[in-house]
């Protein structure tokens, strides 16, 4: 099996293409991930800061990428971040491999990235799939959490750990997998809850950031 980039009692990080590493990982209870959207995103927020493009974020490459990843996933729950112009494809493709359970809405409270000449998106969507069930009382499908402040952001599309912790805590998952790990927010959330976490990231700089978290 490929040697981990980093490993401790709770977290294992692999540096590489998830399509190469996923076949080497056994079943997990939860896949929680934010894959490339396919929008060629380049952050231009802040002078001289955060201008690097996201790897594999071209539309055709991204679509081909996640379609090749889905058959490799073996999980009870899948929570898959997406956006308004990508979710129909995600819904259809994810539904070929897992029973679909619905869409969650992340209400950010303020507009996010996008074309400044049109409406600013203040939400993201999360496709929920799998045979598993939530733990405890039934929650609503709208999650209200502010975005990570730009000054503390370590990845262009970083998600708040508090929100990810809420999602992980609601599912009976001893092991959480994020095949598009980014800066490791999902792994941080899982570790804080005492869960095992596996992350895969193609860019080494983000593996290093995640390992330090």
Map each language-model feature to its residues.
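Core catalytic lobe of class I
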Residues: 2-208
